[in-house]
Amino acid sequence: AGHTLAANGRYLTYDGKPFFPVSGEFHFARYRREDWERELRKMKAGGVNIVATYIFWIHHEEEKGVFDFSGQRDLRAFVELCGKVGLGVILRIGPWCHGECRNGGFPDWIQFQTDFARRTDDPTYLFYVRRWFCEMEKQVHGLLFGDGGPVIGVQIENEYRSYAEPDREKRKAH
């Protein structure tokens, strides 16, 4: 705790000193957990000071209602390790992520539902998204920058409306 991240009229500051953020991607669930620290230290040695990471829904709720944050899927352990190594974290939480992941990161059970529209304000879709976001919040509780943790930002959604859609009007509600 006690760190400050701010902006003045010309640049960002970290603890009152000029700060130039350099971000790199590391998709933790795609790496063996035992490799995380070595790879993060390589990133830091290369000048990266912020790690952006997708949290692919499909990796954590393969079966509807059954969440898995164990092993290489352990979001909390990954974020804590980033802090230990001295890296800030940007969580890219989706719900749709892309990241060259099947279904854009949607679990199959979401992708192939026919009773609600994905990536819209459909109440059923938003019910599942809210439940997913609440599960992620449990994992990172206390690790946000304001709490003294390394999480300095959160990206919601990804590449929205950046691809051809057959029914754009339905998607405007999102």
Locate the predicted segments by residue.
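A cross-family glycoside hydrolase active-site/sugar-binding cleft signature
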Residues: 22-27, 52-54, 90-94, 155-157
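Residue-level signal for pocket-adjacent positions within structured domains
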Residues: 7, 62-64, 140
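A generic structural signal for short coil/turn motifs at secondary-structure boundaries
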Residues: 31-32, 61-65, 161-166
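Active-site region of glycoside hydrolase catalytic domains
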Residues: 80, 84-174
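A short, mixed-charge helix-start or loop-turn motif at secondary-structure junctions
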Residues: 22, 60-61, 118-119
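Aromatic-lined substrate-binding rim segments of carbohydrate-active enzymes
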Residues: 36-104, 108-110
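N-terminal carbohydrate-binding accessory modules
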Residues: 1-50, 80, 84, 88
